[in-house]
């Protein structure tokens, strides 16, 4: 699991253990970085270790883990009523080649937060975002914050701009790569143009929390981040309480806003010696009452239609998954490296995208 600083996960697991003394769950806390937790699971599964019965599984791990034969097929275990209540895109993201391997728990999507006390009419296009950022930034406040560190967050940020220009990355079915198309160049040029103008020079070192803390301290007009930020800005001790709105990410004229789909769910290791007990826990922790409790404690958005707050519905309808390919981690690493090189002025955007496209084609094949 992720680090349990609030004790929320421990509370839920204790409830399960009290109800099922014959199927007790022991929580293993992993490191905070998602890719490091992925490595933790991968190392165990490569040795066919049964040390992990249940996997708290990121949306992008499913194709890799399934292709490697590490997860149990859960297609015939999930009741029809639950299938109807879980969000469609989250069910798809937990599936591979038509079979379900991960039961959704929490959904997520990229969103644009803005200071509604400053901006009366929120931006719809990339040009609007620049214009409004320039108008309202000052010596104490930047215009636009995002996540530019070399990690998966950079990919999710870039994809939303890329999709907003009408472009794409990889077609999971045909393995076609689109990174050397004009739309990708426009997207990277836009992202690069924000650095030092409407975004701080240090934005290329920011992950979610660095950018969120600055925005929540009142030091920016706009923030691209995930849905969890909404609850944090509304807390009593938040300096921007009651002054924040959220809208879909901006897009090019004539194009459509798209958000990167994120989210977490629960899968079962193929190497478990306790598949029935593991399934009991997956059933329990994805129940509406447990997901609602975690939402109230952590701000996580339940992946059930019956529990999604209405203000998030337009955002989630625009959410799009990243390519469901077993080579996803390597493809993401390629894109991260070349985007970072271009943002740091080590290479031109044109060169970065051309090389990223070439390496990605070699990786995924025709």
Describe the role of every protein-language-model region.
Residues 1-63, 80, 238, 253, ...:
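Conserved N-terminal structural module of periplasmic/extracytoplasmic solute-binding proteins
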Residues 75-86, 148-149, 167-186, 235-239, ...:
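Short, solvent-exposed loop/beta-turn-alpha elements that line the ligand-binding surface or hinge
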Residues 57-109, 121, 127-130, 241-247, ...:
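Hinge/lid segment of periplasmic solute-binding proteins
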Residues 101-105, 110, 130-177, 183, ...:
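Extracytoplasmic/periplasmic solute-binding protein
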Residues 132-135, 173-205, 249:
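Glycine-centered hinge/linker elements that transmit conformational signals in sensory
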Residues 29-41, 60, 126-128, 202-216:
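Short helix-initiation/N-cap motifs at beta->coil->alpha
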Residues 317-366:
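Conserved C-terminal helix/tail region of periplasmic/extracytoplasmic solute-binding proteins
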Residues 18, 26, 185, 189, ...:
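Extracytoplasmic/periplasmic substrate-recognition and gating elements
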């Amino acid at each position: 699991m992720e680090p349990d600083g609030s004790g929320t996960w421990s509370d839920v697991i204790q409830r399960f253990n009290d109800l099922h003394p014959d199927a007790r769950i022991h929580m293993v806390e992993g490191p905070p970085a998602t890719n490091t937790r992925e490595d933790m699971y991968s190392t165990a599964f490569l040795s066919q270790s049964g040390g992990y019965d249940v996997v708290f599984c990121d949306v992008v791990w499913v194709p890799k883990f399934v292709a490697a034969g590490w997860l149990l097929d859960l297609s015939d275990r999930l009741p029809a009523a639950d299938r109807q209540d879980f969000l469609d895109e989250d069910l798809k993201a937990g599936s591979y080649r038509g079979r379900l391997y991960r039961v959704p728990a929490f959904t997520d999507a990229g969103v644009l937060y803005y200071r509604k006390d400053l901006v009366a009419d929120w931006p719809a296009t990339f040009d609007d975002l620049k214009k409004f950022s320039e108008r309202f930034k000052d010596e104490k406040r930047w215009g636009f914050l995002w996540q530019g560190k070399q990690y998966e967050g950079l990919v999710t940020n870039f994809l939303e701009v890329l999709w907003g220009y009408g472009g794409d990355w990889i077609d999971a079915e045909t393995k076609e790569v689109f990174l050397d198309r004009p739309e990708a160049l426009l997207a990277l040029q836009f992202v690069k143009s924000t650095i030092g103008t409407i975004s701080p020079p240090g934005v290329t070192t920011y992950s979610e929390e660095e950018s969120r803390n600055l925005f929540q301290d009142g030091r920016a007009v706009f923030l691209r981040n995930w849905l969890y930020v909404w609850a944090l800005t509304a807390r009593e001790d938040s300096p921007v309480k009651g002054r924040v709105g959220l809208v879909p990410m901006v897009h090019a004229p004539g194009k459509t806003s798209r958000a990167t789909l994120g989210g977490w769910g629960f899968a079962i290791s193929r190497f478990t010696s306790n598949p029935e007990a593991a399934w009991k826990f997956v059933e329990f922790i994805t129940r509406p009452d447990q997901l609602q409790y975690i939402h109230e404690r952590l701000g996580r958005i339940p992946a059930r239609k019956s529990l999604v707050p209405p203000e998030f519905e337009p955002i989630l309808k625009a959410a799009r998954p990243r390519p469901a390919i077993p080579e996803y981690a390597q493809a993401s690493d390629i894109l991260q490296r070349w985007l970072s090189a271009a943002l740091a002025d080590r290479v031109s955007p044109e060169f970065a995208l051309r090389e990223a496209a070439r390496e990605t084609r070699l990786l995924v094949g025709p």
